[in-house]
From Swiss-Prot:
GO biological process terms held by the UniProt record: RNA metabolic process
Main localization (coarse): nucleus
GO molecular function: ATP binding; ATP hydrolysis activity; DEAD/H-box RNA helicase binding; RNA binding; RNA helicase activity
Catalytic activity annotation: ATP + H2O = ADP + phosphate + H(+)
Gene name in the database record: RH7
PROSITE patterns per UniProt: DEAD_ATP_HELICASE, HELICASE_ATP_BIND_1, HELICASE_CTER, Q_MOTIF
Homology family: Belongs to the DEAD box helicase family. DDX21/DDX50 subfamily.
Native source species: Arabidopsis thaliana (Mouse-ear cress)
Places the protein is found: Nucleus
Name of the protein in its database record: DEAD-box ATP-dependent RNA helicase 7
Residue numbers spanned by region Disordered: 1-84, 627-671
Lineage: Eukaryota, Viridiplantae, Streptophyta, Embryophyta, Tracheophyta
Positions where Phosphoserine occurs in the chain: 40, 42
Protein origin, superkingdom: Eukaryota
Amino acid composition bias (Basic residues), ranges on this chain: 50-60
One Gene Ontology term, aspect cellular component: nucleus
Length: 671
């Protein structure tokens, strides 16, 4: 009972409160009725009533407006939420998102840690096929992620897929995976990927390549590994030493197959692939940037008949990377050492640069002429090469000068610029060299220097499906302007505390020089930027203090000797002999050549004396020139008198007493 009484009292209190709240409304209604009666008796009260109504209308209108605003703002919030949800939906629906594939949690976490949230097209296109056990030929442009296209599905298959039950376990186990690559540098990088991703799944790998200790490699194989990555030569050696057993092999991969052909590994690769007794029990994957006939032959011989092919290049004429800007600049060998630093300044954008030269001698001499660069070629000891490559990857120096040995072994996202000292004779080599930049979604620049008289630039354009931008060498005055801007920024950064120490010298210079403050400051900036003079640079050969002239004879010109004959009629022989880079125009109506800046007036005056037999003018825009393919060179050679850099005490990049000639001396080397 007490509880009932208590609740009744509470209810009573609630009722009283409710009545108290309702009463003002009733009272106000009652008051309004009384007010109406009173207002009918008085005009004054009537006017008051009208005013009151107006106020009520304004108040109601204001309230309605607030409601509309409130509704519209809430609608905006709803719509903005819808927009955000829409964006999120788009991100989730990315068909190449890692979450869309059968990738286990440890691998997903590792990919996320490396900033990979979606697979590249070649990876996405091949993942399910490889994981489901199909033999595959994969083709994509250089730098498009072919390595992870086989690393990820192979690892998943070994741990969670079809290969798990067949994998041998324990000490001394035979490998389940064999990966062949053309260079030790590339082999080490692929092995590093298997270590990084496979390590998270408890799988072990080893890398076998020449130059590394046999006993160390043999020890790893004896203890047992799941994955073997290596170069054909060293893999073949271990097979002959009976260190490799392919009885439990489930995957064999040929990466950069086209490059193995180019580097002469055909017999080794075929021998290694033939060591698998029952190829029907092994899944074979072949990845390549191009598909020459040997690669197609290998796929027909060693892959199953129901093999799959994923070709992301197809009939597209563009075989080289489409994220790379391709530039061709005419250059005389003697101008190269001075030109290359300016090219780096113009096109590297603060990133790293790789310079490719054709021989070890070129690499050594050029790296010695470029500040802060390092050399990489086949005669450098392996241990030093590894230190050099590690330093380049870690950004300890910005410029690497290399032979083709490094072309396929570097996968560094920050390489912004590739410079090739001359067009390679093989188009595939150009594709792979230029592919060292513009990787992993980045953009890059590939500059090719060429001799305008003998060049394979047009052939590369045709076969690689690219279009070169034919540009003149960066002119020193352009470089100076850029350097002046950088110097000005450095001046602004000078701490105010050091200014008083230089004020006296500045005042004295201003008073005694007879120059304006503006001119003095410009000279100071020039000195800071490293310029004490600006030399003109030829459009034809890029040589400093030379100017390019265009000769026309009013009739077709079929040979350089005709041009020399015209010039000798009006000019001294010694001056004619000193012209550089004589080339005929593509339309056969003229020729271009370089003369020293100091001889320009002499040549122009000579043309005026020719009685109209020829005309000469300074070239502003280079006309299209006839090209001559360079003569084929033997793979081996060397020795002899002088060298290709200029012979006779000088070098190729800075002149010298005479032209070097290869002899019939010692045997050359591959790199």
């Amino acid at each position: 009972m007490p509880s009932l009484m208590l609740s009744d009292k509470k209810e009573e209190k609630k009722m009283k409160k409710k009545m108290a709240l309702d009463t003002p409304e009733l009272d106000s209604k009652k008051g309004k009725k009384e007010q109406k009666l009173k207002l009918s008796d008085s005009d004054e009260e009537e006017s008051e009533k009208k005013k009151s109504k107006k106020k009520d209308k304004k108040r109601k209108a204001s309230e309605e407006e607030d409601e509309v605003k409130s509704d519209s703002s809430s609608e905006k919030k709803k719509s903005s939420k819808k927009v955000k949800l829409g964006v999120e939906d788009v991100e989730v629906d990315n068909p190449n998102a890692v979450s869309k594939f059968r990738i286990s949690a440890p691998l997903r976490e590792k990919l996320k840690a490396n900033g990979i949230e979606a697979l590249f097209p070649i990876q996405a296109s091949t993942f399910d096929m490889v994981l489901d056990g199909a033999d595959l030929v994969g083709r994509a442009r250089t730098g498009q992620g072919k390595t992870l296209a086989f690393v990820l599905p192979i690892l998943e298959s070994l741990v969670n897929g079809p290969a798990k039950s067949k994998r041998k376990m324990g000490y001394g186990r035979s490998p389940s995976v064999l990966v062949l690559l053309p260079t030790r540098e590339l082999a080490k990088q692929v092995a590093a990927d298997f270590d990084a991703y496979g390590g998270s799944l408890g799988l072990s790998s080893c890398c076998l390549y020449g130059g590394d200790s046999y006993p160390v490699q043999e020890g790893k194989l004896k203890r047992g590994v799941d994955i073997v990555v290596g170069t054909p030569g060293r893999i073949k050696d271990h097979i002959e030493r009976q260190n490799l057993d392919f009885s439990y092999l489930q995957f064999r991969v040929l990466d950069e197959a086209d490059e193995m052909l180019r580097m002469g590994f055909v017999e080794d690769v075929e021998l290694i692939l033939g060591k698998v007794e029952d190829s029907t029990k092994v899944q074979t994957l072949l990845f390549s940037a191009t598909l020459p006939s040997w690669v197609k032959n290998i796929s027909n011989r060693f892959l199953k008949r129901d093999q799959k092919t994923i070709d992301l290049v197809g009939n597209d004429k563009m075989k080289a990377s489409n994220s790379v800007r391709h530039i061709a600049i005419p250059c005389n060998k003697a101008a190269m050492a001075r030109l290359i630093p300016d090219i780096i300044s113009c096109y590297s954008s603060g990133g790293q640069t790789i310079i490719f030269a054709e021989t070890k001698v070129q690499v050594s001499e050029l790296s010695g002429l470029l500040d802060g660069s390092r050399a990489l070629h086949g005669e450098i000891p392996q241990s030093q090469r590894e230190v050099t490559l590690a330093g380049f990857r870690n950004g300890k120096f910005a410029t690497l000068v290399a032979t083709n040995v490094a072309a396929r072994g570097l996968d560094i996202n920050d390489v912004q610029l590739i410079i090739q000292c001359e067009p390679p004779r093989e188009v595939e080599a150009y594709i792979h060299r230029s592919g060292r930049t513009g990787r992993a979604g980045n953009t890059g620049v590939a500059v090719t220097l060429y001799d305008s008289r003998k060049s394979s630039v047009s052939r590369i354009e045709k076969e690689a499906g690219i279009k070169f931008e034919h540009l003149a060498a960066p002119q020193p005055d352009e470089i100076a302007r850029s350097g002046g801007m950088e110097a000005a920024e450095k001046v602004k950064q000078v701490c105010d505390s050091v200014v008083p120490a230089f004020l006296e010298a500045a005042k004295e210079l201003l008073e005694t020089s007879g120059l304006s403050a503006e001119v003095l400051l410009a000279k100071a900036l020039a000195k800071t930027a490293g310029f004490t003079e600006i030399k003109k640079r030829s459009l034809l050969t890029s040589m400093e203090n030379y100017v390019t002239l265009h000769l026309e004879a009013g009739k077709p010109i079929y040979s350089p000797s005709f041009v020399y004959g015209l010039l000798r009629r009006v000019l001294p022989d010694d001056k004619v002999e000193m012209i550089e880079g004589l080339s005929l125009t593509a339309d056969k109506t003229g020729a271009v050549f370089d003369v020293k800046q100091s001889d320009l007036d002499l040549f122009i005056a000579g043309a005026q004396k020719s009685a109209g037999s020829m005309s000469l003018e300074v070239v502003k825009v280079m006309p299209k020139l006839q090209e001559r393919e360079p003569l084929p060179q033997k793979r081996f050679g060397g020795g002899g008198r002088g060298n290709r850099f200029g012979g006779g005490g000088g070098n190729r990049f800075g002149g010298g007493g005479g032209r070097g000639r290869g002899g019939s001396g010692g045997r050359g080397q591959r790199y």
